[in-house]
Amino acid sequence: MAAPVGPVKFWRPGTEGPGVSISEERQSLAENSGTTVVYNPYAALSIEQQRQKLPVFKLRNHILYLIENYQTVVIVGETGCGKSTQIPQYLAEAGWTAEGRVVGVTQPRRVAAVTVAGRVAEERGAVLGHEVGYCIRFDDCTDQLATRIKFLTDGMLVREMMVDPLLTKYSVIMLDEAHERTLYTDIAIGLLKKIQKKRGDLRLIVASATLDADKFRDFFNQNETSDPARDTCVILTVEGRTFPVDIFYLQSPVPDYIKSTVETVVKIHQTEGDGDVLAFLTGQEEVETVVSMLIEQARALARTGMKRHLRVLPMYAGLPSFEQMKVFERVSRSVRKVIVATNVAETSITISGIVYVIDCGFVKLRAYNPRTAIECLVVVPVSQASANQRAGRGGRSRSGKCYRLYTEEAFDKLPQSTVPEMQRSNLAPVILQLKALGIDNVLRFHFMSPPPAQSMVQALELLYALGGLDKDCRLTEPLGMRIAEFPLNPMFAKMLLESGNFGCSQEILSIAAMMQIQNIFVVPPNQKSHAIRVHRKFAVEEGDHLTMLNIYEAFIKHNKDSKWCQEHFLNYKGLVRAATVREQLKKLLVKFQVPRKSSEGDPDLVLRCIVSGFFANAARFHSTGAYRTIRDDHELHIHPASVLYAEKPPRWVIYNEVIQTSKYYMRDVTAIESAWLLELAPHFYQQGTHLSLKAKRAKVQDP
């Protein structure tokens, strides 16, 4: 088919490209800490009428029949078919929550667990937290006696198994959005298969928005004969309301999909009929860039006398809910809506009125390189499954068109599906959880997609260095078990547990809590320089960790005042959440009898404590003007958002995480003394042969 925009070349992720920015989300990606809205197009109808309008309603009795007769049911249904909100209610109505039993529904994202729980509670006329509740990290909104439908993240389900390995209170577990194949979805999948062998009465529903159902069926089906009548797993497809979508490819690649997205929107607006536009990009920064460019284009078109106007709206998980709701608002016939979104709009929400889809062909994923032991966010080409999901967004209300900003040949070379997180993540938290659940031989654990052996070895080495595993790779007592109990990266857990010994548990609690929050700084586009000047008042020469401590302490000193946050361009909701997280972490420190101590303003105590947890993330300034990791000599740079950026580079630093755009950038960076690494982590920098040991020691010792 004809190409919608002109010929140019693709840029490769990892090279300098105008479509990529260094101001990116935290490792968690914005979905986990943002707000997701639940849009209801049938709000004018009664609750019962609304429920009956959903495609899944026609299959209610059939779904209940299959759950009664099969241990596992794989349900394939597009976003908006009602599977997430209705199936748990069908189960409750059919008696699966009688006699104190619970239906559990997992979500890969915290915000989805909260918002879907809220919608189900509303439909049932219940108070959220009573019959219907949710449980996410640092926030348990359930009643142990009353809750019968429980929404929770897959990570929290795995944590529940540490207390109740057979999940005895649950009659049914529904793994929702299983196609996302997150780290903890995959662990839950493997563990639930083990539980099913011991609990024949436990029913499992695997809900997916993509056609990967065969993989799930093959994994869970315990029928070892050739007789299909003995299958324990079955697939059911919920037909949605879809229309054909014409696909348009480029004739030759483009170098800048940001610019091409804008050009394609303008071309659609000038040449195509009615219908709204949905454009997919990789992150918040790109979305905001395209929105501002399109607003300029819309003004220019209005000046030419064009009667139909453009209403340009952003959509990403970190956007406040009232801003997200704007994408669902109806507009007059003289206005065309253009929604510029991240992949949150791929399967998480359904927006009516979309006829035209623009797919940039890329997505931002977390990726771990076991050779360098660096985990970072990286922009990579989408999978064919994701590209098809994106295209399908244009065929919900009538036939649509999808403009792919890449060639058909490029599409044919895309991977069929996204690589599961299990095969591209740092596995230290996974191994720790499995060990805590009594699975000693993690290499033989039944993973749906086995992780690379090198990643497993790296994770075991880090956990041994942290003191969480002994030389036989068994969980240590009490340190290993305690690290496993923290709902945090093992490095954070070790830092917190050591804080009493360093005499700074009060400060470390605040720092750890602040590091879990995304986007503490607010930078309005029209007040950028002023906001940055105000932010500098909190900065200290030691780096980002103590700067975050300063901000938190100032917030508490000013009685958590929202007006004070506004005046200082700080994220009020984020700081309130940091205070909540801190309280939860404090309870764990009390449980483990970590002394309540303050450093009384001595920064070295705090910095040494941080090194005790994050020694593996150390880098040294090199004569080339960049930093180098100590163990494998990998090049890193200080992120422009760091208070250390544009200052005289410290010789030695530690960092929380790395993101990759045009370079590898360290985020949350703090200056340290090299001697602290040898003092606090000799076991990490003294492994291997005598020769390599000498080389490592030489690297860490200042000349």
UniProtKB/Swiss-Prot annotation:
<comment type="subunit">
    <text>Identified in the spliceosome C complex.</text>
</comment>
<keyword id="KW-0507">mRNA processing</keyword>
<dbReference type="Pfam" id="PF04408">
    <property type="entry name" value="HA2_N"/>
</dbReference>
<dbReference type="GO" id="GO:0003724">
    <property type="term" value="F:RNA helicase activity"/>
</dbReference>
<dbReference type="InterPro" id="IPR001650">
    <property type="entry name" value="Helicase_C-like"/>
</dbReference>
<dbReference type="GO" id="GO:0005654">
    <property type="term" value="C:nucleoplasm"/>
</dbReference>
<keyword id="KW-0347">Helicase</keyword>
<dbReference type="GO" id="GO:0003723">
    <property type="term" value="F:RNA binding"/>
</dbReference>
<dbReference type="GO" id="GO:0005524">
    <property type="term" value="F:ATP binding"/>
</dbReference>
<dbReference type="InterPro" id="IPR007502">
    <property type="entry name" value="Helicase-assoc_dom"/>
</dbReference>
<comment type="function">
    <text>May be involved in pre-mRNA splicing.</text>
</comment>
<dbReference type="InterPro" id="IPR014001">
    <property type="entry name" value="Helicase_ATP-bd"/>
</dbReference>
<dbReference type="InterPro" id="IPR002464">
    <property type="entry name" value="DNA/RNA_helicase_DEAH_CS"/>
</dbReference>
<dbReference type="GO" id="GO:0016887">
    <property type="term" value="F:ATP hydrolysis activity"/>
</dbReference>
<feature type="domain" description="Helicase C-terminal">
    <location>
        <begin position="261"/>
        <end position="438"/>
    </location>
</feature>
<dbReference type="GO" id="GO:0001701">
    <property type="term" value="P:in utero embryonic development"/>
</dbReference>
<protein>
    <recommendedName>
        <fullName>Probable ATP-dependent RNA helicase DHX35</fullName>
        <ecNumber>3.6.4.13</ecNumber>
    </recommendedName>
</protein>
<dbReference type="Pfam" id="PF21010">
    <property type="entry name" value="HA2_C"/>
</dbReference>
<keyword id="KW-0547">Nucleotide-binding</keyword>
<feature type="short sequence motif" description="DEAH box">
    <location>
        <begin position="176"/>
        <end position="179"/>
    </location>
</feature>
<dbReference type="InterPro" id="IPR048333">
    <property type="entry name" value="HA2_WH"/>
</dbReference>
<dbReference type="Pfam" id="PF00271">
    <property type="entry name" value="Helicase_C"/>
</dbReference>
<dbReference type="GO" id="GO:0000398">
    <property type="term" value="P:mRNA splicing, via spliceosome"/>
</dbReference>
<keyword id="KW-0067">ATP-binding</keyword>
<keyword id="KW-0747">Spliceosome</keyword>
<dbReference type="GO" id="GO:0071013">
    <property type="term" value="C:catalytic step 2 spliceosome"/>
</dbReference>
<dbReference type="InterPro" id="IPR027417">
    <property type="entry name" value="P-loop_NTPase"/>
</dbReference>
<keyword id="KW-0508">mRNA splicing</keyword>
<dbReference type="InterPro" id="IPR011709">
    <property type="entry name" value="DEAD-box_helicase_OB_fold"/>
</dbReference>
<comment type="similarity">
    <text>Belongs to the DEAD box helicase family. DEAH subfamily.</text>
</comment>
<feature type="domain" description="Helicase ATP-binding">
    <location>
        <begin position="64"/>
        <end position="229"/>
    </location>
</feature>
<dbReference type="GO" id="GO:0004386">
    <property type="term" value="F:helicase activity"/>
</dbReference>
<keyword id="KW-0378">Hydrolase</keyword>
<dbReference type="Pfam" id="PF07717">
    <property type="entry name" value="OB_NTP_bind"/>
</dbReference>
<feature type="binding site">
    <location>
        <begin position="77"/>
        <end position="84"/>
    </location>
    <ligand>
        <name>ATP</name>
    </ligand>
</feature>
